């Protein structure tokens, strides 16, 4: 029998980021209770040998599943050590892959407090606004001028530890070009 390949969209990730992500998810599920309804599935509960963990996040009828893998083929670089993350949106029998920015937006819409459109109107009219955004990772673009003024007025509180962000999990901190300077402070030829 010949080998059959199955191709998935998987984001290559540093294994320490996966450990940090899993511990943040568990903290907010069991300690702070901000991620109530989320389900963490260990590697020994999965029948697939490459899956290291799964986090199921209910979004109304649908759910978001963040699957972390180990033992994958290594990448082009030395630090791509075979760890990865896939992000899947499921509704009944339909499933599709989503990017980290969209995953953060979906989590933000369903779970964490944010400014409503009415909050901007209330602030302009001089009424008291008590809401604040708890999940800054869910905003992937610059808001309106009124929104920016409102965020300057009401500072978001810092949550320790931070809420788990899918975009932060898959960000590529290794491939960013390093700024190098010679001893006089000038850019060298091999730097960017």
Swiss-Prot record:
According to the record, the residues making up region (Membrane association) are: 171-172
The disulfide bridges present are: none
Ranges annotated as biased composition (Basic and acidic residues): 170-185
Phosphoserine, modified sites = 144, 165
Which residue ranges does the record annotate as region Multimerization? Answer: 151-164
Tagged with keyword Electron transport: no
- Tell me the function of this protein: Counteracts the innate antiviral activity of host APOBEC3F and APOBEC3G by promoting their ubiquitination and degradation. Acts as a substrate recognition component of an E3 ubiquitin-protein ligase complex: mechanistically, Vif hijacks a host cullin-5-RING E3 ubiquitin-protein ligase complex (ECS complex) and the transcription coactivator CBFB/CBF-beta to form an active E3 ubiquitin-protein ligase complex that targets APOBEC3G and APOBEC3F for polyubiquitination, leading to their degradation by the proteasome.
Question: Anything noted about its domains?
Answer: The BC-like-box motif mediates the interaction with elongin BC complex. The HCCH motif (H-x(5)-C-x(18)-C-x(5)-H) mediates the interaction with CUL5.
State the remark under miscellaneous: Vif-defective viruses show catastrophic failure in reverse transcription due to APOBEC-induced mutations that initiate a DNA base repair pathway and compromise the structural integrity of the ssDNA. In the absence of Vif, the virion is morphologically abnormal. HIV-1 lineages are divided in three main groups, M (for Major), O (for Outlier), and N (for New, or Non-M, Non-O). The vast majority of strains found worldwide belong to the group M. Group O seems to be endemic to and largely confined to Cameroon and neighboring countries in West Central Africa, where these viruses represent a small minority of HIV-1 strains. The group N is represented by a limited number of isolates from Cameroonian persons. The group M is further subdivided in 9 clades or subtypes (A to D, F to H, J and K).
The identity of this protein, by name, is Virion infectivity factor
Organism, by scientific name, is Human immunodeficiency virus type 1 group M subtype C (isolate 92BR025)
Q: What is the lineage of its organism?
A: Viruses, Riboviria, Pararnavirae, Artverviricota, Revtraviricetes
């Amino acid at each position: 029998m010949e080998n059959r390949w199955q191709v998935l969209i998987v984001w290559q990730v540093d294994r320490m980021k996966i450990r940090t992500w899993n511990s943040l998810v568990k903290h907010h599920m069991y300690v702070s209770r901000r991620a109530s309804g989320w389900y963490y599935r260990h590697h020994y509960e999965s029948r697939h040998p490459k899956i290291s963990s799964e986090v199921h996040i209910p979004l109304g009828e649908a759910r978001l599943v963040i699957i972390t893998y180990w033992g994958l083929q290594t990448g082009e670089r030395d630090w791509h050590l075979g760890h990865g993350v896939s992000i899947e949106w499921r509704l009944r029998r339909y499933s599709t892959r989503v990017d980290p920015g969209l995953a953060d937006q979906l989590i933000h819409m369903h779970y964490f407090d944010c400014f409503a459109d009415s909050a901007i109107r209330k602030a302009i009219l001089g009424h008291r606004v008590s809401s604040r955004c708890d999940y800054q990772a869910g905003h992937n673009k610059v808001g309106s001028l009124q929104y920016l003024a409102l965020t300057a007025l009401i500072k978001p509180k810092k949550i320790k530890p931070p809420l788990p962000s899918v975009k932060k999990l898959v960000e590529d901190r290794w491939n960013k070009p390093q700024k190098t300077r010679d001893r006089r402070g000038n850019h060298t030829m091999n730097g960017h």
